[in-house]
Regions:
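Short, aromatic/basic-rich helix-turn unit that serves as a nucleic-acid recognition element
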Residues: 1-15
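Short, conserved phosphate-binding/catalytic loop or strand-edge motifs used
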Residues: 28-41, 78-83
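Proline-centered turn/helix-capping motifs that create local helix->coil transitions or kinks
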Residues: 67-75, 205-208, 274
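Short, polar N-cap/turn motifs at the start of nucleic acid-interacting alpha helices
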Residues: 74, 136-144, 234-253, 264
């Protein structure tokens, strides 16, 4: 039931926010200001106020237990403040970056990274779901991907564009059963390819990383899909596909978007793809 779900969420939150900065420290050396820093870091990363409160609640219950069990005289997690002003991330690929980005993805020598990044972009799914994509969730004939459990605990059905189906067909030949992106770790599937994504962005001349000004992270691809659909009524699949046609058609679509920088760079991108 839900208990199991929240336990798993707590584990994930512990790993994501507490283990890295504090995992190697002795309990008795952890101070209130360290925990405050954990919360403000999460806010700076653009985590929602709800998520930051959940991290605070988790820290609070962990240290209360440590006091109950006699490991600590008092909890450093009492009265931790949440500012309530998370920096909302609204980074997505800009018109003038899109063509450079496609070009850089196509030039990526690691096929797995290339396919994963393109699928993240074309499906708008969460990176954790793309990494853990399983063949049994995918119906290529119907062009559908049924995710059993997403971050919010709900199942989700994603329509796969012809481009996404094409990428998956090519992968299917290599990894017919199990995970679409097998990995060597405990989970059996790939972990988020941070280095590979950074490589692609570097190649495209786009800043990367949460701590870099205007830097992109893999999760921003999810936002990119929504922003472009909202802005143009054209799906990214169509925009991406336009790069696959000789430049006349591609330029026509970009012209419809009425975005000058894209029109200039689209020819370079199309040239790179052929």
């Amino acid at each position: 039931g839900n208990k199991k779900l929240s336990w798993r969420d707590d584990q994930q939150r512990f790993r994501d926010y507490l283990q890295k900065p504090l995992g190697k420290r002795k309990l008795s050396t952890i101070t209130k200001s360290m925990l405050t820093r954990v919360l403000s870091d999460a806010e700076r990363q653009g985590k929602s106020v709800g998520t930051v409160r959940q991290i605070r609640a988790l820290a609070s219950s962990l240290f209360t237990k440590a006091v109950d069990w006699g490991y600590l005289p008092a909890s450093p997690a009492t009265d931790l403040k949440v500012s309530g002003t998370s920096v909302s991330r609204d980074r997505f690929l800009q018109p003038d970056e899109l063509a450079r980005f496609f070009e850089a993805v196509v030039a990526e020598p690691n096929e797995t990274v290339r396919d994963l990044v393109l699928l993240a972009l074309l499906t708008g799914a969460r990176r954790s779901n793309v990494c853990a994509m399983h063949w049994r969730e995918i119906d290529l004939k119907a062009g559908v991907w049924k995710i059993k459990r997403t971050k919010n605990g709900e199942p989700q059905t994603i329509t796969l564009s012809p481009e996404a189906v094409e990428i998956l067909r090519a992968r299917q030949a290599a990894t017919a059963n199990g995970f679409v992106f097998p990995g060597t770790g405990k989970t059996g599937h790939i972990a988020e390819p941070r280095k590979g994504f950074a490589r692609i962005l570097e190649r495209a001349g786009i800043p990367h990383g949460r701590d870099t000004e205007n830097g992109m992270v893999l999760h921003d691809l999810r936002r990119t899909l929504g922003s472009w659909q909202a802005r143009t009524g054209a799906s990214l699949a169509i925009i991406g596909k336009s790069l696959n046609h000789k430049s006349q058609q591609a330029t026509a679509i970009y012209a419809r978007l009425d975005l000058d920088p894209v029109r200039q760079s689209v020819n370079t991108a199309t040239a790179a793809m052929f």
